[in-house]
Each structure stands twice: as structure tokens, then as C-alpha cells.
């Protein structure tokens, strides 16, 4: 009989999000960047914990807007709508489809302060997917700040690590 269960943490990984630098604002928050795939078929982690940052433009911003990061699951045979499991620009077909296939990882309220870096941390993929974790998924980044993100690639990052239980005897 086990004495206790410890939580173990995998190695921190950085997602490929080429194209998020200079990402244009989209009023409907349907256009954005799909990340590279997070594939859990080999490691079998119980959860993934995400952190990240995005830097807005120096000017032209509108108050009371937002940056969104969504999780999108592979269904075992394919990707929904425009998603394909590769780091690429995507425009979701409609708000209704977005609401049906995307799960909110984080929504960051923004203001009109230029050159501000918006951080998020400790966001659980399992919680975003309402308690179930798909074998593969991508993240989708979109915003409606009224100005493109900073053009410097290093101003933006999404990283994660896997989490799994270890039974001690």
C-alpha cells in the first residue's frame, strides 16, 4: 500500500509561436496564431501548467480590450475547423465555432498603456478542458487591443511543464 503520492514536474518547454510578434489586432478575436502541438501521447502527463507573456505596441491602443489564449484539442483523427497542429496564422470561421471548439486558458484585460507586457502564469490545461486532458492540443492566441503586438519576437513567450503523480511506497 502506498505511503503517499507526490506531485512531480517535467522539464519546462517553450512553445513555438512564430508569428505572434506583430500579430494584428482583430475586433472579433477570430484571427490569431496557432502554436506548435503539445503531444502527450508519449509522456502521459496528468496536466500541463502554462505561463507566458505578450508585449503590446507602443501606441494606438484602445482601453478595455483583451488578449486571449485558447486551448484546442485534437479529436483523435483530426483538428477542428482551421486548426492543423502546426504553428501558423489562423482565422476561425465564426464566433459560434470558436465557442464550440476553443477552451479558455486565459483572458487578460488590457488598457491603452503602450509597451506594456502582460503576463500570465500557473494556468492548467486540464482545468481549461474542464477536467479532461486530450492526447494532443494546440494553443491559439488572439487580441483586440487595436494595434499589433510588439514586433520583437523575444517580447512574447508561452512555456509549460508537465505534471504527474508519483506513488511512494
Residue ranges: model-predicted function:
Residues 92-130:
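Extended, solvent-exposed segments with strong compositional bias
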Residues 46-55, 65-74, 129-156:
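Internal, hydrophobic beta-strand segments that form the core of beta-sheet-rich folds
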Residues 5, 28-30, 41-42, 49, ...:
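Intrinsic disorder/low-complexity detector
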Residues 1-21, 132-136, 142-169:
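C-terminal interaction-tip segments
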Residues 2-56, 60, 167-168:
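Solvent-exposed, flexible loop/coil segments flanking beta-strands in beta-rich domains
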Residues 40, 124-125, 141-144:
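Asparagine-centered strand-capping/turn motif at beta-strand->loop junctions
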Residues 65-91, 157-163:
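Extended low-complexity, serine/threonine- and proline-enriched intrinsically disordered segments
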Residues 2, 61, 75-78, 86-94, ...:
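Exposed regions on extracellular, virion, or secretory-pathway luminal proteins
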